[in-house]
């Protein structure tokens, strides 16, 4: 019987809100979920990148997206704020779907709590142009 998210996953979901706020976003997307998971050393080892590398890759993806519409900010791309807003940000529909899907991975593992690795598995299922899929591809 699945009991819900583990303490580690709860912490990752809170960090995802912080990651979204640091990037100036008003909703938590799948990319923010991935960045939050990269705070965990075990998940970072599975992905092959830590949160700093993930944030750098996300900034480069932002830069490329802006360049694609003719905006080249060069080195003037605003730096992330050093302090995130603490308000609870809503999840995008894709992020809600990934969190929900992580329960199926926990069920398949026959465990009672959803762990960060289960959310990572759900994010790895996402296809481009989903933000987590694009970020995972950029991380190699």
Kindly label every feature range from the protein language model:
Residues 1-140:
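Histone-fold recognition with a strong bias for associated Lys/Arg-rich disordered tails
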């Amino acid at each position: 019987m699945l009991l819900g998210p583990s303490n580690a996953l709860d912490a990752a979901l809170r960090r995802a809100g912080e990651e979204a706020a640091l990037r100036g976003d008003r909703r938590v997307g799948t990319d923010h979920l991935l960045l939050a998971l990269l705070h965990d050393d075990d998940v970072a080892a599975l992905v092959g990148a830590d949160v700093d590398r993930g944030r750098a890759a996300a900034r480069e993806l932002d830069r490329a997206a802006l360049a694609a519409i003719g905006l080249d900010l060069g080195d003037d791309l605003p730096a992330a704020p050093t302090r995130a807003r603490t308000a609870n940000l809503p999840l995008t529909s894709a992020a809600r779907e990934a969190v929900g899907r992580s329960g199926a991975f926990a069920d398949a593992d026959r465990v009672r709590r959803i762990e960060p690795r289960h959310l990572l598995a759900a994010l790895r299922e996402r296809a481009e142009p989903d933000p987590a899929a694009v970020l995972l591809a950029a991380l190699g």
